[in-house]
Amino acid sequence: MSVNLLKETGPREVFCGLTSIVWLHRRMPDAFFLVVGSRTCAHLIQSAAGVMIFAEPRFGTAILSERDLAGLADAQDELDRVARELLERRPEIRTLFLVGSCPSEVIKLDLARAAERLNDELRGRVQVVNYSGSGIETTFTQGEDGALSALVPLLPSTDQRQLLMVGTLADAVEDRLTHLFGRIGIDSVCSLPPRKSTELPAVGPGTTVLLTQPYLTTTARLLRDRGARVLTAPFPLGAEGSRSWMEAAAKDFQINADQVASVLDPLVARAQSALAPHREILNGKRIFLLPESQLELPLARFLQRECGMELVEVGTPYLNREQMAEELALLPEGTSVMEGQHVENQLDRVRATQPDLVVCGMGLANPLEAEGIATKWSIELVFSPIHGIDQAGELAELFSRPLRRRELIRQALNPPSSALIDSDPVHA
């Protein structure tokens, strides 16, 4: 391993895992996510999702009051009452996620016991599961890891030979990848999370798992415990990473390399054409990735190898060396990879190095923009359909756009001076 692995601890600037509800509730329309938390939790999710509460979205918050926090009320009884009222009002709900938060964890509210009690009462009409979306020890993408980990014990068992893609993808991207795997020769492909929470994929010794996201560490471990084989491969961001990701599955299924190349070569050629205009803007530019989403290593690999950017520093909240081994191997020798965060120290390094672009959280973006440093919100990368060979151009555009916008603003503020074309003197 030729990269320079570093680690630091200190104050952090990240969203909590409740944010992942925004994409999970869209993925599984028959599920409901009930956060047990404070008004701050409710405001966060509603703002992040951009949904008015009167629209009756598939998430909500059971707000812990001062009496709950002080131990003057039985929070378990109140939670049961709220859950019953919710399920009575929304009979279409098939899976209810009880989601822990910082306040519920502080008062040691046992959501696992609540889920078990509700399951006994509902007798299979609704499946109730629980996980933690607290941000005390985790970053925002790990909320999905918690949700999927809660589903793994519910997956049926199978010995069938199949490929399981794990991690939320846009429906169109998932359909495209499934189609491409079929053309390669892998016909049995399923996904976790499924599009319906009641149609869980089966898992067993014949299951090969491809992670679509790098932050699903716990889910991967639980799937291994169920007998599945979890592949280690570059993640499907950019043409190169997506190709290697699909080739890893093809190799595991013992599919002829020429067959794989016949399907993927034209797609890669088209992706390189789509990348070309963005590479013109990004080539040679310096980028600093602050830790937030755990997508930073695959993004750094894509931006350096396919877009020609120079990596100043690559931060990541947590680093699973085994799971990220393929990504680390593709980074340039000497690349600084910083695990963890001391936000003040990292901002000092940003100011000292003056990169052309910084990938960071929304809370840091505006202050850095005010200092003249271009930024890209890391959360936008989670909400955008960026996976797969076909999406390489769109992924590059997310990074070229802020630089192009900054150049247009610079030109507008500093128009070229118009030379006088008449040689005659100008009279008042």
Curated annotation (Swiss-Prot):
One of its GO terms (molecular function) is 4 iron, 4 sulfur cluster binding. Gene3D superfamilies: Nitrogenase molybdenum iron protein domain. Signal peptide: none annotated. Its EC number is 1.3.7.7. Pathway: Porphyrin-containing compound metabolism; chlorophyll biosynthesis (light-independent). Keywords: 4Fe-4S, ATP-binding, Chlorophyll biosynthesis, Iron, Iron-sulfur, Metal-binding, Nucleotide-binding, Oxidoreductase, Photosynthesis. Binds 1 [4Fe-4S] cluster per heterodimer. The cluster is bound at the heterodimer interface by residues from both subunits. It comes from the Bacteria. GO terms for biological process: light-independent chlorophyll biosynthetic process; photosynthesis, dark reaction. [4Fe-4S] cluster binds at residues 16, 41, 102. It holds the Pfam family Oxidored_nitro. Its cofactor is [4Fe-4S] cluster. It catalyses: chlorophyllide a + oxidized 2[4Fe-4S]-[ferredoxin] + 2 ADP + 2 phosphate = protochlorophyllide a + reduced 2[4Fe-4S]-[ferredoxin] + 2 ATP + 2 H2O. It is an enzyme of class 1 (oxidoreductase). HAMAP family: ChlN_BchN (MF_00352). Protochlorophyllide reductase is composed of three subunits; ChlL, ChlN and ChlB. Forms a heterotetramer of two ChlB and two ChlN subunits. Component of the dark-operative protochlorophyllide reductase (DPOR) that uses Mg-ATP and reduced ferredoxin to reduce ring D of protochlorophyllide (Pchlide) to form chlorophyllide a (Chlide). This reaction is light-independent. The NB-protein (ChlN-ChlB) is the catalytic component of the complex. Belongs to the BchN/ChlN family. NCBIfam families: DPOR_bchN, PRK02842.1. This is Light-independent protochlorophyllide reductase subunit N.
